[in-house]
C-alpha cells in the first residue's frame, strides 16, 4: 500500500526510516487510514493511487468518511484530534471532542445504573473504566481534559448521593462520601467508601508520558530484539499495573518411590 501511494523512506545511516521529503506518510490501523501530504493536489494524487490499488482487491474508499483537510483545521483519528495551531506553531494531539463526549455519556450511564448500589460497588465499577481511558490517552496532551472530567465526575457523584439519600442535604452527602481518602494525595474531594477506605481514582493522577518512536527497522518478529520490545511493553503498562513476576527457576525432583 505504501509503495502504491508513493511513500519512500531514507536508507542513509543517519536518517534511516525517515520519510523522503516530497513523499506521503501513511498511518494505518485496521481499516482506518491517514495519509499526510504536502498539498491538496498531492493529497488528491495519493487518493487516486490508493483507489487504483484497492480496486483489484474489491475495496473502495467510504466517501462519506474520506476527507482532505488542512492540518490547521485538524482531523480526528482513533479518538484523537491532530491539529497544527498557527498561533503557537505547534502540532498537538489531544483526545477528540467526540471521544470526550462519548466518555462523559458513558460515565453518566454507568452511574445511573448504580443508583441503587452502595459506594463500594460504584467505585469497583468505575475505577477500571477510568484507568483504561486514562491509559489510552496518557501519551498525548490530555492533562486539561483529565482535570475537566474529574471535576464533572464530582458533580455526577453528588447527584448519585442525592438519589441514594433523597431526604439528606448536599452537605450531609459531602461529609458522608467525600474527603481525603487517598493517603498519598491531598485531594479533598475524593469520592470514597468510609467503611473500606476505597476511593474513586482520578484521571489527573495519570502522568503524561509521551510516545517513544520505534527504532527504524525494528521488527517485533526479530529474535535479536526481544529485549528491546520487552522494555517497550513494560514502559507502556497502564498506571497502577504491576509487572508480571519473574518465573520461578525450575528444579529437578526425584519422584517418591523411585530409586
Report each predicted region and the residues it spans:
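Non-catalytic terminal/accessory segments
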Residues: 1-259
Amino acid at each position: 500500500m505504501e509503495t502504491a501511494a508513493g511513500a519512500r523512506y531514507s536508507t542513509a545511516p543517519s536518517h534511516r526510516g525517515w520519510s523522503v521529503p516530497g513523499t506521503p506518510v501513511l498511518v494505518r490501523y485496521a481499516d482506518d487510514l491517514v495519509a499526510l501530504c504536502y498539498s491538496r493536489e498531492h493529497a488528491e494524487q495519493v487518493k487516486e493511487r490508493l483507489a487504483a490499488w484497492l480496486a483489484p482487491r474489491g475495496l473502495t474508499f467510504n466517501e462519506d468518511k474520506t476527507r482532505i483537510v488542512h492540518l490547521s483545521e485538524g482531523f480526528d483519528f482513533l479518538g484523537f484530534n491532530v491539529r497544527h495551531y498557527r498561533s503557537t506553531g505547534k502540532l498537538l494531539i489531544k483526545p477528540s471532542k467526540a471521544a470526550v463526549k462519548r466518555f462523559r455519556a458513558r460515565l453518566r450511564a454507568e452511574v445511573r445504573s448504580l443508583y441503587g448500589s452502595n459506594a463500594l460497588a460504584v467505585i469497583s465499577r468505575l475505577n477500571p473504566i477510568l484507568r483504561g481511558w486514562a491509559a489510552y490517552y496518557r501519551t498525548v496532551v490530555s492533562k486539561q481534559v483529565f482535570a475537566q472530567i474529574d471535576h464533572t465526575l464530582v458533580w455526577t457523584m453528588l447527584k448519585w448521593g442525592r438519589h441514594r439519600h433523597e431526604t439528606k442535604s448536599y452537605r450531609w452527602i459531602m461529609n458522608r462520601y467525600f474527603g481525603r481518602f487517598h493517603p498519598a494525595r491531598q485531594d479533598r474531594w475524593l469520592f470514597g467508601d468510609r467503611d473500606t477506605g476505597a476511593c474513586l481514582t482520578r484521571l489527573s493522577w495519570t502522568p503524561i508520558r509521551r510516545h517513544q518512536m520505534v527504532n527504524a527497522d525494528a521488527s517485533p518478529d526479530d529474535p535479536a530484539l526481544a529485549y528491546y520490545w520487552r522494555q517497550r511493553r513494560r514502559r507502556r503498562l497502564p498506571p497502577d499495573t504491576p509487572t508480571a513476576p519473574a518465573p520461578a527457576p525450575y528444579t529437578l525432583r526425584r519422584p517418591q518411590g523411585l530409586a
